[in-house]
Amino acid sequence: MTKVVLLFIVLIVAIQAKKKLSADEIKQINQDCLKSSGMDSSVIKNIVSYDTFPKASDKYTKYLECMYVNQGYLDKDGLISYETIEDFILDFYDLDTVKLAIEPCVVHQDGKSGGERAYNTAKCLIKNLEKLEKQHEKEHKDITGKLA
């Protein structure tokens, strides 16, 4: 779960669009999105500290929409760019895992706004990655148990 939550945080604050941004630019975007959404920065910090995924709220979905737009994960029409997200997640997982995690989410562009779609996508990806990690851990445990 920690790896998945950390990935989510990086997905929020790291830029993996066509243009790489500097750490200062990323910090500025994060600050701008926090300010424009009215989001409390402690909520973002708690995601890492407590392994929790925040509940949807107007402020949080506005924050996510701002971050996703600036990262290239959300296009100007408010639709999720799964290709861009996939490129980013490939830095952390193998291609098969990424495809299995993203595939169930792609068919859904659920939400009335880009922010709701960003939230629903993040939630879907985290759920799928957690499931795949648990499955992988179980398979690894089964294999190592048979070898002992």
Name these PLM-found stretches.
Residues 2-17:
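Cleavable N-terminal signal peptides of Sec/SRP-targeted secreted and luminal proteins
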Residues 13-148:
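Mature extracellular/luminal domains of secreted and GPI-anchored eukaryotic proteins, especially small
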